[in-house]
From Swiss-Prot:
Listed name of the protein: 47 kDa outer membrane protein
UniProt-listed InterPro entries: OMPP1/FadL/TodX (IPR005017)
Swiss-Prot/TrEMBL keywords: Cell outer membrane, Membrane, Signal, Transmembrane, Transmembrane beta strand
Topological type in the membrane: Multi-pass membrane protein
Amino acid sequence: MAKTSKFTQTLLASALAVVAGSASAAAFQLAEVSTSGLGRAYAGEAAIADNAAVVATNPALMSLLKQPEISVGAIYVDPNINLTSPMPGFAYKNIAPNALVPTVYGVYPINEKFAVGGGLNVNYGLATEFDDKYAGGFLGGKTDLTAINFNLSGAYRVTEKFSVGLGLNAVHAKAKLERYAGVALKLKVPNVAQLAALPANTVISKLQGDKWGFGWNAGLVYEFNERNRIGIAYHSQVDINFKGQYSNHFPLAAAALLQTKGITATGGKEIPGTLHLPLPAYWEISGYHKMTDRFAMHYSYKYTQWSKFKELRAKGTDGKTLFSKTEEFRDSSRIALGASYDVTDALTVRTGIAYDESAADEHNTISIPDTDRTWFSVGATYRFTPNVSIDAGFAHLKGKKNTFKEEGVPFTSKASANLYGLNVNYRF
């Protein structure tokens, strides 16, 4: 099959890193696994057993829960990402829509040593949206990716102080992407008469598909005493092998000339293809230290193996490479520090700060304007009864200003986001 367009490379690259926008972690990883964690910027996430949400990060923590428990909630993400450019028509405000990230978890202690649990959370996913008449439609149109993680885990208390956990992950990923002609296409492919007549909102590339991927996770917890413990969690890479359809509305009359520019015209016809999307492995180490009867400190260091992702390669059904695009992501780190205070037996307040490092190095795009970001978080838990409680959390994310070029067009992106979380916990 012939080589696809430079635009198509940008399109499928967006499928890889769509969630980077502003929502949470580096590249296309989401951090929003619990509302209680949100309130402390996820500091101590692999060592704190607030509720059944421990399933999402460190399954070994299930050994600390003494009663069956469920946790249900959601985090509302309100991003604000703006682009500026010295080129007329390429600036754009609010490229990422709001989103709701749901979470559902349950833990069931079988006896003093064994516990099982499961959960559902969105660990990858966001969207970027540009108007179909945007001048840079060739670079940024509509991108939507959701990766829902289903987890089943078990925990075993090896000794009075040491526990281990193991889990299986099934991830269902669904992607839909569109790009438009805009004016950038004519700049990129000049002197093609048939393109001059294309309206800016002409769909020049469309891709959609869904697929399952599978992985595993493990964790351990060591309790020095009732007030101090550390936890380590590891989540394996999950490989998603998308199978979907690609099409564009380039006129077939211009096919031969477009081919010299590296563009395959389909005239609206769909072409089947595959795309490998790796969701990288990561590990996290956390600590929890109760300094007084009411005050505790907690911290985390998280390391994600983005450097495993070297390139993005799409293939046709005949096995031939449609394109290969160098990504060269770098490993990223996240550090977080938080504190909790029990105001009363019924009310706990918490706060945290975190620094989240970008995984993108030299390959930023307007669909994925990844950048370093700082978290500022506050939250609280209120216990109505010993068995019923609610968590509330808020975080403000401030991204570092980022200047880059895509296809020769200069851009500067500024990103921030507000996250609002609410969760209900019930013990049986």
